[in-house]
UniProtKB/Swiss-Prot annotation:
Principal subcellular localization: secreted
Organism lineage string: Eukaryota, Metazoa, Chordata, Craniata, Vertebrata
Cross-referenced InterPro entries: Aurein_antimicrobial_peptide
GO cellular component: extracellular region
A matching Pfam family: Antimicrobial20
Protein's name according to its UniProt entry: Citropin-1.2.5
Length: 18
């Protein structure tokens, strides 16, 4: 669902920020 995509994007952004 859309929320799953949002969580996935948030995870990728979180990893990229570190």
């Amino acid at each position: 669902g859309l929320f799953d995509i949002i969580k996935k994007v948030a995870s990728v952004v979180g990893l990229a920020s570190q």
